[in-house]
């Protein structure tokens, strides 16, 4: 056995020399002894192509390209040992999950870590690392003993505990595998054991190419190959000059030199004959002087500058998308103008999770065939999600999110239904489940579900309509479609006594759902749409899931396992599934990660994402062991994978290999902002290249072509799909500013689209948006009548909504749009409860001919409990009875009603006003309803304003009878005359108008009532700040102040004293008014004269008539109001409908000026002519 090294810098022809030797040997002796060509896994396909790609060698049996793992498979097939089942990454994770669950109580560190994302990936990686470095469970145990004996600090104790846990888990893992299964590292260990018995390898010519380091396990394989083979050639990327002096860890080729010495040591131990090392000094790869200079002087300090013509380009981009589009345009140019093939080009990157989706999308748009050398997770495939969410439903008590994740995979749908119809029905079904809070036992109970449209607390709920019955039947039918297969799965899993029976339950679940047929439908549909990558996904995922179940059964089939552990193990396995990469076609751009890629025969390389922290990478202390812990183990003589510090030192070699891949052109780029617009920095690596090549001018890549030259803009004309967006951009520019100079070629591009039979329809649809104006066209009279009827009947809040935004009114009352109902307690529900509770108490007092003042504190508490218990079953589908949390909330609401009752009691004691009616309807029909406020509009349409008044109070004195309105609010509110002027606050004055106009309801025939005011009563249970020694009476007084009613009252001192008989001078604690010593009102008093109330009444009528006329004439302008920090859009549900956008010319807020009450009153007078 002899050993020969072939060394040389990148591009010196090491691989070419080896391949030519093999090809010459095959040409001369095609049937000689075996030639093994060992390369890293990523290089096998392209090396095989290179080996048999010459004119002389079209095929070969004698020479084979292997990775170490593929060689293991080949040898085990020959000499035996491959009968043990292979366990893949998913199987490893499942087995480790099972071991963790059984070992939990005995672990020190990893007891709770199993629930962290990525834990099993790290744990599996740690065990694989142990194996690669020939560390057995007994070695790990010895490590623990040594560490435990010398642990004095908390950090040392933590490491000892961690090693103890790892030893237990590793030992259990190995015991589970022994004699039955092989993981990837076991194959290599078996290869070491079986190589001496292989006739295939005996006396083989062995080439090892493309490596710059070997793990101890790989070195052991090399040792065995030295014993079996006839001759071994190993290529290493290293400069011969490096051996002339001692190397240190900062040298570019430090790692390679270490590898060279390790292999030589193995050769010495095996007494292998050392042949003369072949040192290659030429650079045949580089056809570009600049790239040759970059390779030759990459590590030079200071940087050797190159002033000649360069084939290196450096770009910064506005964002990631602009960067990738710039790459795509240049690739198309190289292919079109410089005779490149797509296979001549590679795109290299590091942070693939940020780039892969963008690359797939944009390269498809630019018609660039490409291959991404990266495995994709199966986690998001419908089949994997269906199984995972079904198991989560069972383990998580049928939670809403798990149920509808499962539903949205569409694998629960019956096979023969129309998907479009079923999707719509399932959307309705989801809305029902959200509205009724369906989860848990509601899914599995035998009782059918009920459906009732929402009714107020005053409406009866006994009679079911035909519409409700139909919806009920539909909801129960859909319920069975969803729950039946999952309940069957649940029952089978609970009955199962072994893992095999549990896996069988999952298999039957999928078979009974006709999943194979449904996946076949998806595959056919993907093929028909030309998406062949995703078409193969559907075949792969079924096969992988079946393999997963088989592996589970093979490993643990006869074991008993709790349902929760089974679900955890199964979920862990599902999360580890990955799609296999389809080998690239003969002409595709290769997209690869710089850490794992091994490229050859590349003419142009695009390095993208060269940002600070990425190239070179910022070390991340991930994995089971930290750098400090690895250093401790290294000091104890334990060799493991490099620390992040060592990895960082190797970064320069990784980057060196990256920039020396191409023979002709190198492009380096980075975005200056991420997807969220945050600033990114160019890397120090880019700056280094710029220093080496001063003549290279950094260019900026943008998606906005307006500031570019004509030549640069022409480069943006690529595929029709992509160019259409740039035509849009340019026509927007032309629309605003016109074209200047020689940019009128865009009209030629435009003409292509509008005259092309293939693109005319799509371009018309896209380009029509150029003249889009987000305006709502006025409705015709006919459409307005259809939507609103021949007679307008609406509440005051509807009229206020129109003045806030006419389009929001149209969406809610014309189109009848509404948010979907969610099973939760919102502010309107709480407000409704408060109103109903106070009404019930007040009705009881009226029936008993008592007032609030007659109630004791104990009665207030008793009544608050009584009414809440009565209302709770009727509110929002019994939401207050649905959970312990809502039961607690019910108690808090009862306390608010209790507090409010106490305050109303105090108000009643201090007031000459008494409630005479509650929840007074007007325009609602029925004997108890007051008539509506009626209008005949100028266009002849009749309009009625209707509503319900919370409370009407009456007081009498020698000057007459007075009526006032009290409105209960669950938030603080005051009457702002500016809002009255703009028609945004009409409710209270309307109510006052209605009761004054219908005063006979509460008075003797012929008597006239005067307006006393309108007041808001804030229902709440306030907190107050008091001194530590405050008495209970003082605290109650402070609380009472928090209930001061705001609004507008009659500017009559006697009437104000009727509202607060304790008021002589100063501010009232009950209403927002105060008196000076001379009997006049204080400046802060919110008062109006009787004449002003009359003016306000006229103005409200005038405003309603204006609103009614606009509604009937079809005004639906997208014109939300804005006043100060208030805006109609703030809480609007219809923004996604109207698409209001301030950047559009037609979309601007209707800005309203805030005014003092006196100024607003003056404007109101002007409007009504007084």
UniProtKB/Swiss-Prot annotation:
Originating species: Bacillus cytotoxicus (strain DSM 22905 / CIP 110041 / 391-98 / NVH 391-98)
HAMAP family associated with the record: AddB_type1
Binding positions for [4Fe-4S] cluster per the UniProt entry: 805, 1129, 1132, 1138
Known partners and oligomeric status: Heterodimer of AddA and AddB.
Gene: addB
Similarity comment text for this entry: Belongs to the helicase family. AddB/RexB type 1 subfamily.
Highest taxon of source: Bacteria
GO MF, any single term: ATP binding
PANTHER family listed in its UniProt record: RECBCD ENZYME SUBUNIT RECC
Cofactor, how bound (note): Binds 1 [4Fe-4S] cluster.
Protein name: ATP-dependent helicase/deoxyribonuclease subunit B
Required cofactor(s): Mg(2+); [4Fe-4S] cluster
Misc. comment: Despite having conserved helicase domains, this subunit does not have helicase activity.
Domain UvrD-like helicase C-terminal as annotated: residue spans: 281-587
Domain (UvrD-like helicase ATP-binding): residue spans on this chain: 1-343
The protein's role, per its UniProt record: The heterodimer acts as both an ATP-dependent DNA helicase and an ATP-dependent, dual-direction single-stranded exonuclease. Recognizes the chi site generating a DNA molecule suitable for the initiation of homologous recombination. The AddB subunit has 5' -> 3' nuclease activity but not helicase activity.
Keywords: 4Fe-4S, ATP-binding, DNA damage, DNA repair, DNA-binding, Exonuclease, Helicase, Hydrolase, Iron, Iron-sulfur, Metal-binding, Nuclease, Nucleotide-binding
GO annotation (BP), single: double-strand break repair via homologous recombination
NCBIfam families: addB_Gpos
EC number, UniProt record: 3.1.-.-
Record: residues binding ATP: 8-15
């Amino acid at each position: 056995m002899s050993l020969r090294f072939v060394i040389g810098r990148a591009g010196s022809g090491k691989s070419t020399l080896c391949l030519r030797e093999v090809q010459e040997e095959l040409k001369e002796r095609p049937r000689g002894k075996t030639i093994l060509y060992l390369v890293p896994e990523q290089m096998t396909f392209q090396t095989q192509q290179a080996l048999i790609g010459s004119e002389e060698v079209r095929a070969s049996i004698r020479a084979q390209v292997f990775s170490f793992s593929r060689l293991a498979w080949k040898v085990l097939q020959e000499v035996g040992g491959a009968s043990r089942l292979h366990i893949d990454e998913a199987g490893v994770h499942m087995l480790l999950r099972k071991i963790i669950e059984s070992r939990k109580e005995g672990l020190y560190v990893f007891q709770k870590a199993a629930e962290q994302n990525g834990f099993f990936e790290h744990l599996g990686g740690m065990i694989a690392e142990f194996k690669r470095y020939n560390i057995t469970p007994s070695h790990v145990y010895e490590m623990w003993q040594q560490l435990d004996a010398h642990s004095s600090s908390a950090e040392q104790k933590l490491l000892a505990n961690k090693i103890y846990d790892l030893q237990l888990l590793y030992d259990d893992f190995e015991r589970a595998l022994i004699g039955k299964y092989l993981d990837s590292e076991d194959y290599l260990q078996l290869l070491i054991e079986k190589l001496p018995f292989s006739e295939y390898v005996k006396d083989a010519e062995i080439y090892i190419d493309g490596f710059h380091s070997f793990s101890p396990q790989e070195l052991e394989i090399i040792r065995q190959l030295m014993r079996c083979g006839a001759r071994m050639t190993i290529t290493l990327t290293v400069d011969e000059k490096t051996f002339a002096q001692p190397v240190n860890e900062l040298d570019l080729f430090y790692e390679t030199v270490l590898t060279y010495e390790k292999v030589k040591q193995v050769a010495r131990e095996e007494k292998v004959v050392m042949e003369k090392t072949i040192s290659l000094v030429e650079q045949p790869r580089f056809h570009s002087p600049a790239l040759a200079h970059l390779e030759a002087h990459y590590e030079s300090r200071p940087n050797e500058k190159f002033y000649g013509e360069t084939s290196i380009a450096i770009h910064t981009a506005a964002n990631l998308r602009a960067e990738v589009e710039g790459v795509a345009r240049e690739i198309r140019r190289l292919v079109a103008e410089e005779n490149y093939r797509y296979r001549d080009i590679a795109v290299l990157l590091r942070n693939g999770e940020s780039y892969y989706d963008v690359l797939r999308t944009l390269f498809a748009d630019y018609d660039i065939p490409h291959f991404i050398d990266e495995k994709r997770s199966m986690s998001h495939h419908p089949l994997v999600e269906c199984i995972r969410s079904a198991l989560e439903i069972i383990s998580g008590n049928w939670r809403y999110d798990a149920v509808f994740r499962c539903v949205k995979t569409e694998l629960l749908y019956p096979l023969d239904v129309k998907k479009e119809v079923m999707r719509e029905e399932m959307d309705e079904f989801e809305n029902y489940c959200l509205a009724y809070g369906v989860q848990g036992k509601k899914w599995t109970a035998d009782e059918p579900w009920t459906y009732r449209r929402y009714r107020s607390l005053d409406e009866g709920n006994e009679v079911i309509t035909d519409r409700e019955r139909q919806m009920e039947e539909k909801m129960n039918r859909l319920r069975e479609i969803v729950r039946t297969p999952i309940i069957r799965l649940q029952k089978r899993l609970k009955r199962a006594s072994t893992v095999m029976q549990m896996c069988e339950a999952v298999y039957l679940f999928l078979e009974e759902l006709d999943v194979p047929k449904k996946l076949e439908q998806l595959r056919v549909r993907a093929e028909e749409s030309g998406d062949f990558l995703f078409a193969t996904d559907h075949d792969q995922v079924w096969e992988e899931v079946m393999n997963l179940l088989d592996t589970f059964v093979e490993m643990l089939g006869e074991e008993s396992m709790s349902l929760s552990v089974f679900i955890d193990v199964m979920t862990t396995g599902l999360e580890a599934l990955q799609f296999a990469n389809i080998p690239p076609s003969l002409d595709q751009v290769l997209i690869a990660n710089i850490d794992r890629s091994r490229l050859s025969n590349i003419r142009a390389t695009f390095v993208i994402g060269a940002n600070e922290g990425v190239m070179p990478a910022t070390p991340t202390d991930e994995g089971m062991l930290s750098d400090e812990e690895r250093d401790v183990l290294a000091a104890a003589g334990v060799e493991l994978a490099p620390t992040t510090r060592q990895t960082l030192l190797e970064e320069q070699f990784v980057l060196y290999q990256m920039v020396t891949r191409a023979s002709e052109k190198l492009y380096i780029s980075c975005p200056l902002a991420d997807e969220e617009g945050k600033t990114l920095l160019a890397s120090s690596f880019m700056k280094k290249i710029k220093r080496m090549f001063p003549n290279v001018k950094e260019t900026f890549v943008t998606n906005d072509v307006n500031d570019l030259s004509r030549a640069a803009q022409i480069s943006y004309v690529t595929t029709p799909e992509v160019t259409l967006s740039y035509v849009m951009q340019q026509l927007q520019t032309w629309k605003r500013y016109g074209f200047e100079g020689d940019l009128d070629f865009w009209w030629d591009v435009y003409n292509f689209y509008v005259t092309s039979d293939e693109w005319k329809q799509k371009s018309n649809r896209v380009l029509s948006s150029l003249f889009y104006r987000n305006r709502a066209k006025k409705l015709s009279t006919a459409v307005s009548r259809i939507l609103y009827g021949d007679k307008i009947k609406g509440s005051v809040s509807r009229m206020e909504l129109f003045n806030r935004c006419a389009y929001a009114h149209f969406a809610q009352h014309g189109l009848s749009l509404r948010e979907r109902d969610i099973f939760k307690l919102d502010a309107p529900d709480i407000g409704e409860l408060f109103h109903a509770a106070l009404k019930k108490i007040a009705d009881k007092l009226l029936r008993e001919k008592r007032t609030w003042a007659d109630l004791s504190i104990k009665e207030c508490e008793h009544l608050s409990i009584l009414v809440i218990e009565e209302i709770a079953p009727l509110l929002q589908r019994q939401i207050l009875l649905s959970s312990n949390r809502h039961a607690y909330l019910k108690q808090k609401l009862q306390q608010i009603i209790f507090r409010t009752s106490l305050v109303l009691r105090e108000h009643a004691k201090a007031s000459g006003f008494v409630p005479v009616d509650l929840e007074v309807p007007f325009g609602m029909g029925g004997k108890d309803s007051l008539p509506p406020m009626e209008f005949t509009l100028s266009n002849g349409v009749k309009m009625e304003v209707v509503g319900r008044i919370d409370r009407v109070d009456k007081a009498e004195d020698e000057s007459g009878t007075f009526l006032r309105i009290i409105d209960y609010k669950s938030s603080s509110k005051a009457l702002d005359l500016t809002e009255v002027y703009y028609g945004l606050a009409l409710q209270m004055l309307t109510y006052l108008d209605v009761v004054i106009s219908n005063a006979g309801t509460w008075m003797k025939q012929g008597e006239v009532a005067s307006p006393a005011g309108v007041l808001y009563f804030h229902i709440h249970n306030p907190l107050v700040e008091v001194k530590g020694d405050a008495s209970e009476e003082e605290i109650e007084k402070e609380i009472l102040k928090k209930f001061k009613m705001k609004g507008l009252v009659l500017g009559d001192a006697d009437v104000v004293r009727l509202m607060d008989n304790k008021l002589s001078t100063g501010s009232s604690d009950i209403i927002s008014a105060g008196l000076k010593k001379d009997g006049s009102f204080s400046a802060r008093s919110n008062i109006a004269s009787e004449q002003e109330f009359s003016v306000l009444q006229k103005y409200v009528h005038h405003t309603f008539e204006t609103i009614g006329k606009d509604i009937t004439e079809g005004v639906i302008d997208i014109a939300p109001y804005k006043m100060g920090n208030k805006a109609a859009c703030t809480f609007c549900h219809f923004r996604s409908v109207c698409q209001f956008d301030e950047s559009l010319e037609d979309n601007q807020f209707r800005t309203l000026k805030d005014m003092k009450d006196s100024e607003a009153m003056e404007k109101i007078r002007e409007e009504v002519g007084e």
